[in-house]
Design a protein with these regions (language model features):
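Short, hydrophobic/amphipathic alpha-helical packing segments
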Residues: 28-33, 73-80
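Active-site-proximal substrate-binding groove within the catalytic cores of carbohydrate-active enzymes
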Residues: 50, 76-176
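Active-site groove signature of glycoside hydrolases
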Residues: 27-62
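Alpha-helix capping and helix-loop boundary segments enriched in small/acidic/polar residues
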Residues: 15-19, 23, 63-74
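Aromatic- and acidic-residue-enriched segments that line the glycan-binding/catalytic groove
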Residues: 1-11, 59, 63, 106-116
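Active-site-adjacent "subsite" loops/lids of carbohydrate-active enzymes
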Residues: 1-38
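A cross-family glycoside hydrolase active-site/sugar-binding cleft signature
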Residues: 1, 45-47, 93-95
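Short, small-residue-rich loop/turn micro-motifs
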Residues: 3-6, 10, 48-52, 158
Length: 176
């Protein structure tokens, strides 16, 4: 990379763009803003299926554990705030690591259209819908299952995503 200071992570391993770094965040804002504008996109999905904790801890000295996380999260929220400022009315879908980032500050800015990666279990979907509906009037789930019970368990949610592989010739389209 041209800017190794922008990245968190050990050499030779996976990296994480450090949104706590002002220049890295400015680059990402400009890049995503350009894509949104040029392509006429009005719904932004942030899918973030990594656990950032080890990246953050690895960047901190023993006596400063948590400082990189603090700066990163502050920068992450500033990133979204700037996208929303540049694109008023744009929806952000927070599909983040199985719903691990459904915190108050995130939910002030975004909606969880896919609240969790745990979508294969009907009872699990029912429990998620029941528990989350007390706090969030609008959230989503999906399923990749085809049974009637599975489908109805997922469809009780305000926003439903069908997670089927439409290339699969064995899908029963009459049933769907």
């Amino acid at each position: 990379t041209n800017n190794p200071a922008w990245l968190l992570g050990r050499d030779g391993q996976q990296k994480l763009l450090n949104l706590g770094h002002d220049e890295a965040r400015a680059w990402l804002i400009a890049h995503i803003d350009r894509l949104l504008t040029q392509q006429g996109i009005d719904l932004y999905r942030q899918d973030y299926n990594i656990d950032p904790l080890n990246f953050w801890r690895g960047a901190d000295t023993e006596d400063r554990q948590g400082i990189t996380e603090n700066h990163y999260v502050t920068g992450y929220l500033a990133y979204w705030d700037e996208l929303l400022r540049r694109h008023p009315g744009m929806l952000i879908d927070t599909c983040a690591s199985g719903g691990h980032r459904n915190d108050l500050e995130t939910l002030r800015r975004a909606l969880p259209f896919l609240r969790s990666d745990f979508i294969q279990d009907a009872v699990g979907n029912q429990c998620h819908t029941y528990g989350l509906s007390f706090w969030l009037p609008y959230h989503g789930t999906g399923t990749d299952q085809l049974g009637v019970y599975d489908l109805r368990s997922a469809m009780a949610c305000p926003h439903f995503i069908a997670c089927w592989d439409v290339r699969d010739r064995k899908l029963d389209y009459d049933f769907l």
